Amino acid sequence: MDKKTSRLRRATRARKKIQELGVNRLVVHRTPRHIYAQVINPEAQVLAAASTVEKAVKELLKSTGNVDAAKAVGKFVAERAIEKGVTSVAFDRSGFKYHGRVAALADAAREAGLKF
């Protein structure tokens, strides 16, 4: 089993557990160059999203693949979710380690007002 398959298996296992809870989830996807975050409801509808690909976020950053970029995305997605009335979510790290950029995004979202 390769690295990607292992990550996807972990992600599927976590998503099934979150699905049983029936709560909104903050999903994170990470690539070497960018980071993406979405708040998704139990019916699989995207309520809020932010990424380093967006012009509004990219203009604030020197680089899109570092911890500072992840913090900016976490702040933006939390603000947009709160505007839609979502204050509590489950954190779905998509099988990535809770470390570095993923942890920075989560911390920034918490500081901006999301609870998880």
UniProtKB/Swiss-Prot annotation:
<keyword id="KW-0699">rRNA-binding</keyword>
<dbReference type="GO" id="GO:0022625">
    <property type="term" value="C:cytosolic large ribosomal subunit"/>
</dbReference>
<keyword id="KW-0689">Ribosomal protein</keyword>
<protein>
    <recommendedName>
        <fullName>Large ribosomal subunit protein uL18</fullName>
    </recommendedName>
</protein>
<dbReference type="InterPro" id="IPR004389">
    <property type="entry name" value="Ribosomal_uL18_bac-type"/>
</dbReference>
<dbReference type="GO" id="GO:0006412">
    <property type="term" value="P:translation"/>
</dbReference>
<keyword id="KW-0687">Ribonucleoprotein</keyword>
<keyword id="KW-0694">RNA-binding</keyword>
<dbReference type="Pfam" id="PF00861">
    <property type="entry name" value="Ribosomal_L18p"/>
</dbReference>
<comment type="similarity">
    <text>Belongs to the universal ribosomal protein uL18 family.</text>
</comment>
<dbReference type="InterPro" id="IPR005484">
    <property type="entry name" value="Ribosomal_uL18_bac/euk"/>
</dbReference>
<comment type="subunit">
    <text>Part of the 50S ribosomal subunit; part of the 5S rRNA/L5/L18/L25 subcomplex. Contacts the 5S and 23S rRNAs.</text>
</comment>
<dbReference type="GO" id="GO:0008097">
    <property type="term" value="F:5S rRNA binding"/>
</dbReference>
<dbReference type="GO" id="GO:0003735">
    <property type="term" value="F:structural constituent of ribosome"/>
</dbReference>
<comment type="function">
    <text>This is one of the proteins that bind and probably mediate the attachment of the 5S RNA into the large ribosomal subunit, where it forms part of the central protuberance.</text>
</comment>
